[in-house]
């Protein structure tokens, strides 16, 4: 039948909102007036009408009764009689007694109906208070009864005749469709629906067309007249929201957004989700569709008319006897014989039919199809016609032939033969499972992690939009659910009520916060306020009770605590605790932690999750928040779902990791995949392929793109702007914010940026949400006198969240009936997020995740223990005989053990070593005793010779008459070093305050101070020594090679012998003391003259060893500027350099290991000395020699030449390059490179034979040699100058070739092929054992000039340049 054939009132879209059968008024309790009404009008109870005294029903005089309301409902029996136009005699009403307990007692009786002309089968109508009988008093109707109150039934059997064309709406919610005629009713159906239909009001009666009479027979209630109280209209029925929801259409599963939280009251929450533990819990049953086929309705009415209405217990099916006490649950029409049957029936599981083909539960019964099909011809029910077609096609499909058909359909778990529900392919084997339980067992046995729902067991398919399943952490495990319905069902099933540990408030476990203490005990709290108070209490930080820190009231019990910046605050209530969180106690910029809600002013720990940014005060709060909110993601390396540890970007894609180990392993694999082109971007820190490379200030940076390079250079050049204050300059703070790099001036700007991002100003918005933002969430409810009653009889009162809501109230109306007002419109909510904000803090934390401890158990975190045996001496007492017998005593005896020694040597020295060993074998006899005697004799002889030589030298020095003999003595032998040492010691004795360096060592040798005449008498110092040649490598021409090589061996013996005096440090120390004494001779110096180190003045000490590094730095700088001779004249720059070298040697000999010429602490002194030496020019003596008081030997003595440090090695290389290559300017030194300075070795012939000579050659650039080569072609090639340094074989410690090789070994290997750099800057953090001493940054010009000025003050530099054959270099 087409739905359009039905009249419009039966259209489900146009049905009015009416109460259904089984719903009682809110003031009527269980069991009272049960059989009075199955349905009630939405406007309340029908008003009483006139009561005829004869008890008969009169006809309507006017056709006004034909007017119907839009819902098609006829109120009162007078309107029904007006439709038929006939008069029927009403039967005598049964006697109704109101017992003392409010039960209804009535007698049974046969009700006869006489059909009139033109009428169909008569229908039994419900009683009407206005149809000639007095209605019961409102007090009797509204008298409350206890739940499950008994009902005394006196006549349980009533027969009913139903017209076949009447269409009825079943009143009980969730009641299934009636079976056809001839089928018994199901146990879940009401046992006697005719009772409600017989004794209800006339609302459910069908509409009648004009000309069709609907005779009714209805018993009237007792009462002959109406009192004033009875005439009054009963109070308007107030419907709860829970009743409205249960009477609504079958609900569809809603998808609840977990990010939004709508404030609901306790009543609303009970209406939305029913608790099976509640007494009024009604299992969900789909309501029968109001549009039934005509055939099914006729069959139902025919079946009802043929069978009696004898009532029985809905559980045990026991017939109810007359006068027996019946039990009924509120809102349900079923009757029970005892309380046990009522309780057992309420706990029965919900029975639903399943589809034969797809095995799913049939929810919508109107679309179901019942057919007789299959091989056995039995009846099967399908959810849709599609399943029926698929089932028939499956039955017609030929069955494949197999060897054993039983094995093909046998379950792999329970080994039962039947239908296969699941097929699992594990490897190459296909497992068939018959049920969900077997599927769960299979997953447990195989250890499979299938994405199945933990509530219903169904497989969770991928949701649209890439959304994953619903997740919930409960009891330390992660639960998965296919939808929000299963999630709600799981919560309802596992909900428990526990008291808060702090405030003892009862709360549900899914709404509480858990805290695990040090002992592993878990405590539950109702809010963060109680959690924080408990932590402060456990830490022992609570002091004596004080007034509330917010409202200054006295504290209640329990009081609440909070700790902010090492200060504990006390509060009287959670509201004061919450309000205090939004205020800054110190007035600065403070952020609120998203976990503990405490204020902090440091750099926050940031977490980005689901397009939101969360801030935390510390790392611990961030980790707890991740476990609490279930911040779980799939690790990119191990592919397991764990807590999120870190998010990193690889080639522009953000990837999640569960631990630092997974980050390192994934980065290692990623680097191997990309190879050498894999870099980490200097700006955005992502690992990707190299895009752009930039070099600046000696540093090389790699970037992923040109954009990152531009932004980084702006930040590096201090041209970027702060994202908070928009200022341009040096930005110290850098963060990653939503995939972008943000820079800030300092931490204050960073905090201001965070506070602006997460705390919008809601007070500037218009609407009621601004008021909600300013009002407190703990405002007291208004008194009834302050509430405003509106026209729709609702009162606006603040709910538990501080929001104004509508609460229905009872209103006593006068006796004159007034039409009810229309339903009020829905209240618009302008700012839904602002109204939900107070609830987001409490409902957002459903349960605390405790998977950290459980997750870490899968990893091998315990280190591997290795047993290491350690010998421990143990004293074992040995019994002795008290010295009466011989006792063994340990005795040590040395045993020679041959130990092989490997001596590093070369091929040249191997033969000499073998010869020396042979000589020792010949020299040392085979008898060890004889060898010891010979060795002792040699030692005694050598000692006697040394004593004799020293005594002769002392006599020679003390003898004044041996002056002529001293002049002829060869003091250039081995004894000269001893004489030099003696001279230095003697010079130290001359510690007089009036020492004058330039007077003792004048430019003219004839003006020598008599106090040091003995030095010249001993031959230590002489004018002829100034021009003494040393055999050291120097530049030469090609034509002079053979001459130089032939003479090299003869001069090798003289190359290591110095021709100068030793450095006398007493001049420098005495000059320092005299300068300090003269500086402070006249008391304190003026403020302009005194030295200052920062804001404090500095006083120089006379003892140079007692001065600190800063005092020595500034003191030496002023010493260089102010030092003068005793006669007041200014010292020459070379003399000042000599004095400073003496101070350096004095510091070293007194174990003060500093270098005042190279250390960075003495930069001020070095700059001042450089200014003095830069203007100095050497003095040419009358004998055409250059005079300088600084000699090469002085530099060796005070460790300015050698390999003591990287700077000293550089100074040594520059000294040799200046001395032998003739490079006297910084430009010439900067032209040196690793490619034009080459080490070469060649063989040459000497009078002693053929020898191998190793040297360093410098091939100067072409532009340097262009001006020097002026002759014709052949002559030009012959006179071409070769700059060369040859090795010093007699003294390898001063060999330039060895220094050059050592310098190459300490330089980076990548720079050894460079043609633009030679001198490199030392590494700041290198030590002597470091493999590299120098960086890739070349020395700057200023440092080279400072070192070169000190080298050019040495006398030997000019002596080497003035040798024959060097004139072509100028």
From Swiss-Prot:
It is found in: Nucleus. Coiled coil: none annotated. Residues 1-73, 85-310, 761-831 are annotated as: Disordered. One of its GO terms (cellular component) is nucleoplasm. The modification Phosphothreonine is found at residues 797, 818, 827. Residues 1-12, 40-56, 130-146 have a biased composition (Low complexity). GO terms for molecular function: zinc ion binding. Residues 265-281 have a biased composition (Acidic residues). Keywords: Isopeptide bond, Metal-binding, Nucleus, Phosphoprotein, Repeat, Ubl conjugation, Zinc, Zinc-finger. Residues 816-827 have a biased composition (Pro residues). There is a cross-link at residues 310, 322, 330, 780, 788, 806, 848, 862, 921, 1276 (Glycyl lysine isopeptide (Lys-Gly) (interchain with G-Cter in SUMO2)). Ubiquitously expressed in all embryonic stages and adult tissues. GO terms for biological process: cytoskeleton organization; regulation of cell morphogenesis. A zinc finger (MYM-type) spans 334-368, 380-424, 431-466, 479-513, 523-561, 569-606, 614-648, 655-694, 701-735. Residues 761-789 have a biased composition (Polar residues). Residues 227-255, 790-799 have a biased composition (Basic and acidic residues). The modification Phosphoserine is found at residues 265, 269. InterPro entries: DUF3504, TRASH_dom, Znf_MYM, ZnF_MYMT-QRICH1. It comes from the Eukaryota. Plays a role in the regulation of cell morphology and cytoskeletal organization. May be a component of a BHC histone deacetylase complex that contains HDAC1, HDAC2, HMG20B/BRAF35, KDM1A, RCOR1/CoREST, PHF21A/BHC80, ZMYM2, ZNF217, ZMYM3, GSE1 and GTF2I. This is Zinc finger MYM-type protein 3. It comes from Mus musculus (Mouse). The gene is Zmym3.
């Amino acid at each position: 039948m087409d739905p359009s054939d039905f009249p419009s009132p039966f259209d489900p879209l146009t049905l009015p909102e009416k109460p259904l059968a089984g719903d009682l008024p809110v003031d009527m309790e269980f069991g009272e007036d049960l059989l009075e009404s199955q349905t009630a009008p939405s406007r309340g109870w029908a008003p009483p009408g006139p009561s005829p005294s004869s008890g008969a029903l009169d006809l309507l005089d006017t056709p006004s009764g034909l007017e119907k309301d839009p819902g098609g409902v006829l109120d009162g029996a007078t309107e029904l009689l007006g439709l038929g136009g006939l008069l029927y005699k009403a039967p005598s009403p049964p006697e109704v007694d109101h017992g003392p307990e409010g039960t209804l007692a009535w007698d049974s009786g046969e009700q006869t109906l006489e059909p009139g002309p033109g009428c169909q089968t008569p229908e039994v109508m419900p009683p009407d208070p206005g149809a000639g009988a007095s209605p019961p008093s409102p007090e009797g109707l509204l008298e409350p009864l206890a739940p499950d109150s008994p009902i005394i039934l006196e006549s349980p059997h009533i027969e009913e005749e139903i017209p076949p064309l009447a269409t009825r709406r079943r009143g009980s919610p969730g009641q299934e469709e009636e079976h056809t005629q001839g089928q018994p009713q199901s146990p879940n159906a009401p046992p006697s629906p005719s009772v409600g239909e017989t004794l209800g009001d006339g609302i459910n009666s069908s509409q009648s067309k004009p000309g069709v009479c609907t005779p009714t027979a209805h018993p009237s209630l007792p009462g002959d007249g109406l009192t004033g109280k009875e005439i009054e209209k009963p109070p308007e029925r107030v419907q709860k929201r829970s009743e409205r929801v249960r009477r609504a259409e079958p609900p569809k599963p809603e998808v609840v957004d977990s990010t939004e939280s709508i404030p609901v009251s306790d009543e609303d929450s009970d209406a939305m989700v029913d608790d099976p533990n509640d007494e009024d819990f009604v299992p969900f049953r789909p309501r029968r569709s109001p549009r039934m086929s005509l055939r099914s309705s006729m069959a139902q009415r025919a079946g009802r008319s043929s069978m009696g209405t004898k009532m029985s217990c809905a559980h045990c099916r026991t017939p109810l006897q007359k006068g027996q006490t019946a039990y009924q649950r509120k809102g349900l029409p079923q009757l029970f014989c005892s309380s046990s049957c009522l309780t057992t029936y309420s706990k029965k599981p919900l029975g639903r039919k399943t589809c034969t083909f797809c095995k799913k539960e049939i929810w919508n019964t109107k679309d179901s199809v019942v057919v007789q099909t299959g091989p056995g011809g039995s009846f099967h029910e399908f959810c849709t016609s599609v399943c029926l077609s698929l089932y028939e096609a499956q039955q017609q499909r030929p069955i494949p032939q197999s060897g054993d058909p039983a094995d093909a359909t046998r379950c792999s778990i329970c080994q039962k033969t039947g239908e296969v529900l699941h097929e699992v392919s594990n490897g190459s084997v296909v497992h068939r499972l018959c049920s969900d339980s077997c599927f769960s067992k299979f997953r447990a046995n195989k250890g499979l992690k299938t994405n199945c729902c933990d509530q219903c067991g169904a497989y969770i398919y991928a949701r649209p939009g890439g959304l994953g399943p619903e997740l919930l952490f409960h009891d330390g495990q992660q639960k998965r659910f296919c939808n929000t319905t299963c999630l709600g069902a799981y919560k309802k099933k596992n909900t428990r009520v526990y008291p808060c540990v702090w405030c003892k408030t009862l709360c549900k476990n899914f709404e509480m916060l858990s805290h695990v203490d040090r002992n592993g005990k878990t405590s539950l709290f109702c809010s963060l306020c109680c959690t924080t108070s408990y932590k402060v209490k456990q830490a022992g930080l609570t002091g004596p009770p004080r007034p509330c820190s917010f409202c200054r009231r006295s504290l209640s019990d329990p009081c609440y605590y909070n700790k902010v910046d090492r200060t504990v605050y006390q509060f009287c209530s959670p509201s004061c605790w919450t309000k205090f969180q939004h205020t800054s106690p110190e007035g600065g910029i403070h952020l609120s932690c998203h976990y503990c809600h405490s204020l902090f002013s440091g750099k926050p720990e940031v977490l980005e999750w689901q397009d939101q940014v969360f801030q935390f005060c510390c790392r611990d709060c961030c980790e707890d928040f991740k476990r609490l909110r279930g911040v779980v993601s799939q690790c990119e390396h191990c592919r397991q779902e764990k807590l999120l540890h870190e998010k990193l970007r690889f080639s522009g894609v953000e990837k999640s990791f569960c631990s630092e180990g997974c980050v390192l392993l994934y980065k290692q694999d990623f680097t191997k995949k990309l190879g050498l082109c894999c870099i980490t971007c200097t700006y955005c820190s992502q690992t990707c392929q190299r895009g752009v490379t930039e070099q600046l200030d000696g540093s090389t940076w790699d970037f992923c793109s040109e954009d990152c390079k531009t932004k980084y250079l702006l930040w590096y050049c201090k041209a970027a702007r702060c994202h908070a204050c928009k200022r341009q300059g040096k930005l110290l703070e850098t963060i990653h914010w939503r995939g972008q790099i943000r820079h800030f001036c300092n931490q204050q700007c960073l905090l201001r940026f965070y506070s602006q991002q997460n705390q919008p100003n809601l007070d500037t918005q218009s609407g009621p949400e601004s008021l909600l933002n300013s009002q407190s969430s703990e405002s007291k409810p208004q008194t009834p006198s302050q509430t405003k009653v509106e026209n729709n009889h609702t009162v606006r009162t603040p709910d538990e969240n501080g929001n104004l809501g509508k609460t229905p109230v009872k209103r006593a109306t006068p006796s004159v009936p007034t039409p009810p007002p229309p339903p009020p419109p829905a209240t618009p909510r302008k700012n839904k997020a602002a109204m939900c904000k107070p609830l987001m803090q409490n409902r957002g934390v459903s349960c605390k995740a405790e998977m950290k401890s459980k997750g870490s158990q899968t990893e091998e975190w315990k280190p591997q223990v290795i047993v290491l045996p350690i010998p421990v001496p143990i004293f074992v007492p040995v019994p002795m005989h008290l010295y009466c017998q011989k006792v063994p005593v340990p005795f040590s005896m040395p045993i020679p053990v041959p130990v092989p020694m490997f001596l590093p040597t070369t091929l040249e020295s191997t033969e000499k070593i073998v010869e020396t060993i042979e000589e020792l074998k010949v020299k040392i006899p085979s008898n060890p005793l004889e060898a010891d005697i010979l060795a002792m004799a040699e030692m005694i002889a050598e000692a006697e010779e040394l004593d004799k030589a020293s005594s002769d030298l002392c006599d020679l020095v003390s003898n004044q008459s041996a002056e002529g003999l001293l002049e002829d003595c060869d003091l250039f032998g081995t004894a000269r070093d001893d004489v030099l040492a003696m001279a230095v010691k003697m010079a130290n004795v001359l510690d007089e305050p009036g020492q004058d360096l330039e007077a003792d060592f004048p430019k003219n040798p004839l003006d020598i101070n008599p106090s040091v005449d003995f030095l010249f008498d001993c031959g230590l110092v002489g004018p002829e020594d100034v021009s003494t040649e040393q055999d050291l490598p120097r530049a030469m021409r090609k034509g002079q090679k053979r001459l130089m090589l032939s003479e090299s061996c003869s001069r090798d013996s003289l190359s290591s012998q110095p021709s100068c005096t030793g450095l006398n440090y007493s001049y420098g120390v005495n000059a320092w003391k005299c300068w300090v004494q003269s500086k402070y001779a006249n008391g304190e110096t003026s403020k302009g003259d005194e030295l200052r180190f920062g804001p404090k003045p500095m006083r120089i000490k006379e003892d140079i060893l007692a001065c600190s590094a800063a005092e020595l730095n500034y003191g030496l700088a002023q010493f260089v500027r102010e030092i003068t001779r005793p006669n007041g004249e200014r010292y020459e720059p070379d003399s000042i350099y000599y004095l400073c070298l003496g101070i350096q040697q004095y510091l070293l000999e007194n174990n003060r290991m500093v270098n005042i010429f190279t250390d960075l602490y003495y930069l001020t002194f070095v700059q001042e000395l450089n200014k003095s030496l830069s203007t100095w020019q050497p003095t040419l003596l009358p004998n055409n020699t250059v005079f300088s008081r600084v000699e090469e030997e002085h530099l060796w003595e005070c460790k300015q030449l050698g390999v003591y440090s990287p700077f000293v090695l550089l100074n040594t290389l520059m000294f040799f390059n200046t001395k032998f290559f003739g490079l006297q300017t910084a430009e010439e030194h900067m032209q040196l490179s690793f490619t034009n300075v080459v080490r070469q070795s060649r063989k040459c012939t000497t009078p002693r034979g053929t020898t191998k000579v190793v040297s360093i050659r410098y091939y100067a650039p072409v532009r340097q040699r262009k001006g020097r080569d002026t002759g014709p072609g052949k002559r030009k090639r012959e006179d071409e100058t070769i700059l060369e340094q040859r090795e010093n074989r007699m003294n390898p410690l001063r060999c330039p070739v060895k220094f050059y090789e050592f310098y190459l070994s300490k330089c980076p290997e990548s720079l050894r092929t460079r043609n633009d750099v030679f001198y490199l800057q030392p590494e700041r953090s290198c030590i002597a054992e470091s493999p590299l001493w120098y960086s890739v940054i070349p020395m700057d010009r200023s440092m080279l000039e400072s070192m070169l000025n000190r080298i050019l003050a040495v006398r030997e530099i000019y002596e080497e340049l003035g040798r024959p054959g060097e004139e072509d270099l100028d």
